[in-house]
Amino acid sequence: MIKDKVVIITGASSGIGEATARLLARRGAKVVLGARRVDHLKRIAMEIEQAGGEALYCPLDVTQQADNDAIVAQAKDKFGRLDAIFLNAGLMPNSMLSALKTDDWHQMVDVNIKGVLNGVAAVLPTFTAQKSGYVLATSSVAGLKAYPGGAVYGGTKWFLRDFMEVLRMESAMEGTNIRATTIYPAAINTELLDTISDQKTASNMRSLYDRYGISPERIARVVEFALDLPDDTLVNEFTVGPANQPW
């Protein structure tokens, strides 16, 4: 059951995060929105509440451990509990390695890898103590299939695949009942392409998304499905994308 579950969503100011927050709130979840663009969060939370839902928003830079700890604390202070976190914040400034976009490389590592580590570090004490909790994370089909221009981005998503699987395995071994699900979206129409600074790569990716891209609400429905499963059941991976996208 989703009703009354308290769910933190990172990267909640647009795209998949925003769509998920709105859908879960309609299902009766208490959603906690985190992102850097506080003005966007404020608007989304207000609209959720005007529609009869419950929402809290907190400024969140996932690269900062203190921010991650703070959003967990605020969620528990406001709603008295925490049931799940959806680690959705991410960047995709793809480029060929020869372009030497080293600032982009480091930014992807900071957000896509360290941001996940920080989020898990923030919730793990709570989930371990209560012997329940759900960690969901947005990866990418780039974490399943290599492609030119996606070396660093894909590498961060391959990391996520291994990390989330080991989190699941260790929880099962230790009896903490922490479930872990990784979602691998293909072409989803979000602001992700706006993070690409290499013009040629951006043009190629935009052509792909213009042809195949589907709504972020499709991924929100996957999160909804996962959270609606009985507590003793887990689907640990979802690969989701346009039905007509070849890869």
Describe each PLM feature range.
Residues 38-39, 59-70, 102:
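The beta1-alpha1 cofactor-binding region of Rossmann-like NAD(H)/NADP(H)-dependent oxidoreductases
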Residues 140:
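Residue(s) in the substrate-gating loop at a strand-loop-helix junction
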